[in-house]
């Protein structure tokens, strides 16, 4: 381990991937020498940890035998992590596995993502999941549509899965699937009208067009106006005359 500290993490990873235990003497040496991981590039640490937490045989019990290794790798106290939830999510997308492990950190998950040099996309998704997992309004249809429009369908499907596994709440996942199955409007690009339609109504200012489109979208998301061209144009005319 002294010659190549990354072998410490590889040992953890192999244990998770292959489902075998490591003898006590070796485990003790891995934990004792974990400070050497500070000499390893963050990207390589992230790669090994990700393979471990996403592994088919991930075990919270076995993972917990390497508290020093994990703490020195991630840069947070092991007690602030949630390997039990990560075990429930094993085999899921990398973002779900990371979010499950880091969920107790809340907004602090962003610092771990930065420290381990996550890609921008992975960091954005992990932070989205950790920040919204316990949001009680997430299952609301309006909120689901709004979040799909802002963060994408894939991220919302992952959020639904995480809430089901972490909280035992399936309503978010069902709502997301229902919205997607019915091809409901979730963003400006889904609306039956666009800026050109508003220009034909005599609206010329770009800022005013943007404001009215946002208002139309919000009304559609709230089911106040159907996503139909005639209804939306009538709504826009009324907004202009106000």
Regions found by a protein language model. Give the residues of each.
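Short clusters of hydrophobic/aromatic residues that line enzyme substrate/ligand-binding pockets
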Residues: 1, 147, 193
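Glycine- and charge-enriched loop/helix tracts that form the active or gating conduit
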Residues: 1-116, 207-208, 212-220, 224-236, ...
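Charged, low-complexity, helix/coiled-coil-prone segments
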Residues: 5-9, 72, 140-144, 153-158, ...
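Generic structural marker for isolated residues within well-ordered, non-membrane alpha-helices
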Residues: 11, 109, 144, 194-195
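Charged substrate- and nucleic-acid-binding regions of tRNA-handling and nucleotidyl-transfer enzymes
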Residues: 13, 162-242
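Residue-level signal for threonine
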Residues: 23-24, 119, 187, 194
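Short coil/turn helix-boundary motifs
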Residues: 55-56, 137, 151, 205
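Divalent metal-dependent catalytic cores for phosphoryl transfer on phosphate-bearing substrates
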Residues: 82-170
């Amino acid at each position: 381990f002294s010659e190549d500290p990354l072998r410490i993490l590889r040992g953890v990873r192999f244990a998770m991937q292959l489902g075998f235990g490591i003898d006590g003497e070796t485990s003790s040496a891995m934990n004792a020498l974990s400070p050497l991981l500070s000499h390893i590039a963050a990207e390589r640490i992230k790669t090994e940890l990700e393979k471990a937490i996403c592994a088919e045989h991930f075990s919270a019990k076995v993972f917990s035998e390497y508290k020093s290794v994990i703490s020195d790798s991630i840069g947070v106290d092991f007690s602030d992590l949630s390997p039990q939830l990560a075990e429930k999510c094993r085999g899921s997308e990398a973002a779900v596995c990371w979010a499950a492990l880091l969920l107790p950190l809340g907004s602090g998950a962003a610092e771990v993502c930065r420290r381990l040099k996550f890609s921008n996309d992975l960091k954005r998704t992990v932070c989205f999941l950790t920040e919204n997992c316990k949001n009680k309004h997430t299952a609301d249809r309006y909120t689901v549509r709004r979040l799909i429009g802002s963060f994408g369908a894939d991220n919302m499907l992952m959020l639904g899965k995480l809430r089901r596994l972490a909280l035992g709440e399936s309503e978010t996942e069902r709502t997301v699937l229902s919205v997607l199955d019915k091809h409901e409007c979730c963003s400006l690009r889904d609306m039956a009208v666009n800026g050109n339609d508003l220009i034909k109504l005599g609206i010329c200012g770009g800022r005013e067009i943007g404001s009215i489109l946002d208002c139309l979208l919000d009304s559609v998301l709230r089911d106040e106006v159907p996503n139909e061209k005639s209804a939306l144009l009538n709504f826009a005319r009324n907004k202009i005359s106000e």
